[in-house]
Amino acid sequence: MKRFFFLCAVMAMAFTASAQQSWVNETYNPQANTEGLAPMGARVISPEVHDNHTVTFRLVAPNAQKVVVRGTMFTGGMEAKSAEMTKDDKGVWSVTAGPFTPDVYTYTFNVDGLSIVDPANTLHNHGTMPASSMLYVHGDGPAYYDPNPNVEHGSVTTSYYNSTVTGGLRTILVYTPPHYDPAKKYPVLYLMGGSGEAADSWYKYGQVNWIMDNLIAEGKIEPTIVAMVNNQIVHRSSPNHSQLSFKMMEREYKECIIPWVDSHYSTITNRKGRALSGLSMGGRHTQYIGFRNPELFGSLGILSAALTAADEKAFGEDAVAMGRDAKALKDAAFDYIFIG
């Protein structure tokens, strides 16, 4: 189970996108634009990522008065810093910024006070909040979160189940490792996203399938099933989100998710065969559900899970229940990791 430590730490650094600019091959440098071709319907190439790790951004906006690009590549925060763009005589705004550390970032254009995605960039994230554009600053070769043509690859399946908690149809994505064999038993990592993310975010932007393929090929983890769970169980803007979300997700796991996964895949069905992890809100769900249910999970990965005042209140209301289970927690001997 200690291998889950390594897996969770790796995934915490890799919330990235999995599509590509050219739509031809899965590659580690999808925005290098080696062919010099703009996407169909676009008038400019943007972003254009250069081998020296600088990036050229372009936007056609002849009537705009001011355009800036804002993104996580500058400081790690969307609004903290920006690069002002200049307009040429054809109405094309541009700026070359960087060099940036090879990684995956998000950015937007601000046009006269209006925030928009890059219309020439085919890679956008999506979820339960406004979209932004994805930026790949590639290194000299594939990173641990990139597709690698030299390793074997698993599969990702999108499925649906009926929830007794929400009373509706819910989405779940499941990664199975290369050469998945129903005659064998596999450990399961249950993985959740943050408050603004969709059910498929860990697949499309976290690239968990590439990460798993690479780690399995390197022998750093055993072949593992990953169940990517939709933890958007209450509308994020609901004033009762924190009070309802934790208990509802706990029920969802116990009544729906774990029984569904165990009945559809060849799994190890004891706590040592299950790990629970999540980013941000998913980390808070992990902390709440995992420590309250030590009989279900043997490993926990709590990633960037700062508690809000409302979260603390929700946790506090269950302090008696958690105290009641103190002996169970002591006997459980969790493997767990906190990051960020």
How would you describe each model-predicted region?
Residues 1-22:
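Bacterial Sec-dependent N-terminal signal peptides
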Residues 20-38, 43-80, 87-340:
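Non-catalytic cap/lid and distal C-terminal segments of serine-dependent acyl enzymes
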